[in-house]
Amino acid sequence: DQMLLANMKRAGNVPTDVILFNIDSKASLDNLDGKDKILSVFEKVFNEKQGLSTIPHVAELERFLIKNNKYEEFKEAVSKECGEDWETARNDFYFRRDEIVNAYSKVMNKSQEEAENWFDKAEENYDISIEKFAKRIKEYIEANDKKHVVFLVDEVGQYAGTDSKALLNLQTMV
């Protein structure tokens, strides 16, 4: 069918970011039975794709800093405070509290108390939903010249298994 072939060629010419992963290998052990266990893995790999932290509330901080054109300045401030680059220090986020708080305070022109309060409540205040995640993907697409994003997920059926919450989570995302 010529129409089908033309559509396939047209689809093949659209710039696309492909995110290929095995869901089980990317899953966190702390969310194996949560209702959003599939969403959390998708969020993690999407953050990785953008060069952000795999820790959700840390990635949220990075998005905030990027949006406010403070990310590079923050990374430099963390490097001065920690003696290592941000990409390394963020993996030890909880052990680098004082250095990160100091850097955030300086870069965002916040008091030490405000920065400490932010740090101490960042994880607790972080919330993600499928709707928020979809908006993030939409923003990413719009910021990247309408480039498509395709998630190719291996072993998702086995990962969800007979967990009705996980299956509903997957169904809602798709």
Can you annotate each of these PLM segments?
Residues 1-92:
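P-loop NTPase motor core
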Residues 13-27, 113-118, 146-158:
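Glycine-rich, often proline-containing surface loops adjacent to acidic residues and nearby aromatics
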Residues 27-31, 107-111, 157-161, 167-168:
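Flexible loop/turn segments at secondary-structure boundaries
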Residues 50-54, 112, 145:
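Residue-level signal for secondary-structure boundary elements
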Residues 55-61, 118-122, 152:
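Short coil/turn segments at secondary-structure boundaries
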Residues 72, 107-111, 144:
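Short, flexible helical or helix-coil boundary motifs
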Residues 79-133:
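Long, low-complexity, polar/charged, intrinsically disordered or flexibly structured peripheral segments
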Residues 125-174:
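Conserved Walker B catalytic segment
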